[in-house]
């Protein structure tokens, strides 16, 4: 129903908008996510477009979109809910322009498998990664194995040398476990 869409849109706007506010606050303290500055203009365009959807902007106001997103339909919602959703996106944009964001993505609606891979992320939201090594199905058939991107820097931080990290990663990718990996204290 139109009312159901409006409520889902407003609640999702609040959830995602507040998550980006928090992400910007985290970036102020700990720095933006790796690759943020390389993608800053695109990231801020996405945030501006989300903000416009919260304000139910006209199609001509969106940047780089050919299809107008469904904005929040205030006719079916309590005014305070609409205002909170709009204010949180105003704040997300304001803080993001100054500090960047700690997270590239903060929420997603499935399917997620390839989306995260294309965005250079292990996960596309707040959920933890489900495996140390994952299989990615290829469109043309077959699979390839990928290791969680946080593993190499974690091993380096633990004091392993570059060559040790490479050997550990090779073992983990091949065996899908750290068990039996060289240099690991089992």
Predicted regions and their residues:
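Long, C-terminal-biased catalytic regions of enzyme "large/alpha" subunits
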Residues: 1-186
């Amino acid at each position: 129903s139109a009312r159901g869409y409006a409520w889902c849109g407003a609640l999702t706007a609040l959830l995602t908008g507040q998550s980006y506010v928090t992400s910007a606050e985290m970036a102020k303290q700990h720095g933006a996510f790796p690759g943020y500055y390389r993608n800053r203009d695109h990231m801020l365009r996405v945030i501006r477009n989300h903000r416009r959807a919260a304000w139910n902007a006209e199609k001509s106001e969106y940047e780089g979109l050919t299809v107008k997103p469904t904005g929040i339909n205030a006719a079916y919602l309590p005014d305070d809910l609409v205002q909170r959703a709009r204010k949180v996106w105003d704040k997300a944009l304001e803080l993001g322009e100054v500090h960047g964001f700690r997270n590239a993505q903060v929420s997603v609606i499935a399917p997620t498998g390839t989306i995260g891979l294309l965005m250079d992320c292990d996960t596309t939201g707040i959920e933890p990664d489900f495996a140390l090594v994952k299989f990615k199905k290829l469109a043309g058939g077959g699979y390839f194995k990928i290791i969680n991107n946080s593993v190499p820097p974690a091993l380096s931080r633990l004091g392993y040398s570059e060559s040790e990290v490479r050997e550990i990663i090779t073992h983990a990718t091949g065996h899908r476990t750290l068990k039996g990996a060289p240099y690991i204290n089992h």
